[in-house]
Amino acid sequence: KFKNDNQELGGYIILKNKKICLSMDAGSTPSLKYTKDYQSGALSFEIISNGKKLISNCGYYKKDNNKLNHLSKSSATQNTLVIDDSSSCKFTKTHNNFLVKNGLKILKKESVFEKNYWKINASHDGYQKKYNSIHEREIEFYPEQMKFIGYDKLVRKDTSKNIKFDIRFHLSPNTKVMKTQDNKSILIELDDEGWKFSCDNFDINIDNGLYLGIKN
């Protein structure tokens, strides 16, 4: 039996050892006046391997009243599940700022941090009102094998209607990627490291992305 030991800082769960740092956004949306710089990235995560970003969100464009500022707040620029290209929060323009009009709540969150096993599990209600869906995500890490396993689940009472969703994983600009012929795996090269990302249930696509962070 593993203990539930939240390693939480400012709404983020952060688990790390000397080689790997795994962090997940597991915080509810703050009140309106504190959302000037808020990004709708609930359950998004980042992975740092040996001091180098492997999985990285797109970053944040700080200048107000700019399309890139609005875009960088969207869920599509975060490593998370997006339904029908809609963000998990709705923004409204107030003066020159985009503030959250409809926020979300984290419904549950838990983490396990053992020497040979890590886990983060959380869910949010950002798609409940419009799509009657709760997004739940679980990420496991096995330090001895350097292996991550992730699960995304949409919990819906009414399953009669199909919904379109995408799960995006943004990679650091320093990575090199190659897709296997069966469209089920991506080979990732990060300096002197090699990683393999696989998905058995869906095809994987590679596309160009936007990176607003500082390139290493």
Segments (PLM) and residue ranges:
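Carbohydrate-active enzyme catalytic cores, enriched for enzymes
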Residues: 1-56, 60
